[in-house]
Amino acid sequence: MDTVNEVTAIVLSGGSGSRFHGSYIPKQFVEIDGKPILAYCLDTYESLPMIDEVVLVINQRYEQLYYDICSTFGYLKVKTFVPGGSTRQESVARGLEAIDPCEIVVVQDGVRPFSSEKSIFEAIEAARIYGAADVVVPTLDTIVEERDGFIVSVPDRTHLRNGHAPQTFRYEVLLRAHEYARTAGAEGATDDAQLVLASGGQVRAVEGSSEGFKITTNIDWLFAQQVLEARRRGWLG
C-alpha cells in the first residue's frame, strides 16, 4: 500500500534573476563560498525530518544545472522537477499540480539561503491548526505611499510586517485558493497568502528571523556572504 506524504515542499527556483546584475546565470546558481545559493536552501529541507518530499520549480533553460546540484549534494528528497510559469502565481500552481494530495504544502523561495528550521517547523504546525501560515518579520523602516512623485500617506508600522518564507498551507486550502483565483481571473499575486485571504481563508503570522532574507540584488548577495561568515564564527544563532 502506498504511503501518503504528510508534508511536501514546493521550492521556487525558476526565476531569471533580472534584478541581479553582473552574472551570466540566474542568481539561484550564483555561489556563496563555492556553493550555489539554491543549495543552501535545499540543504535545510533535505535535513528536516518533517519534510517528506521536495518539488523543485525550475527555469527550464538551465535544467541540467538543477540536476547537477541535486546530484552533487545528494538531495534525495527532490523527486520532481517542474518548469516554472511566467509569474510566481503560475509557478506555484504548476508545482501544486505536480504533487499528490498531502496534509501540508510548504512554499519556499529558493533564493532564501538561511531560512531557519525553527520558523519552518512552527509554520507547518500553524498551518495544521489554522489552515495557512506565513513567516513574517517586523517592518523596521518607515513605509510611505507615493503617487505621481509625491508621498500621500505614511502608514502606522505598528502592525506592518514583511512577508518572508516559507508560507505553509493545508493542501486543500492552497488548492481552493488557486482554484478561486483561476475562476476569478486573478493573476499576478505576489504570494499565496494573498490568494488564501482573497478566497475567504485566514493566515496565521509566524515570527521569523531577519536571516531569512531573499537574495534579489547584488547587495543581498554580498550581505549573505557576511551572514555566512558570522554564522561560522558563532556570532549568529
Q: Predicted regions: what is each one?
A:
Residues 71-103:
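Short phosphate-binding loop-to-helix
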Residues 1-10, 191-193, 197, 210-211, ...:
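SAM-dependent methyltransferases
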Residues 10-14, 57, 107-108, 135-138, ...:
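Short beta-strand segments
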Residues 42-46, 70, 99:
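Hydrophobic C-terminal alpha-helix "anchor/cap" residues
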Residues 2-64:
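N-terminal glycine-rich phosphate-binding loop and ensuing alpha1 helix
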Residues 102-111:
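Short beta-strand-to-loop acidic/aromatic patch adjacent to the donor-nucleotide binding site
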Residues 11, 38, 95, 108-109, ...:
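Residue-level signal for inorganic ion chemistry
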Residues 114-206, 237:
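Conserved core of the sugar-phosphate nucleotidyltransferase
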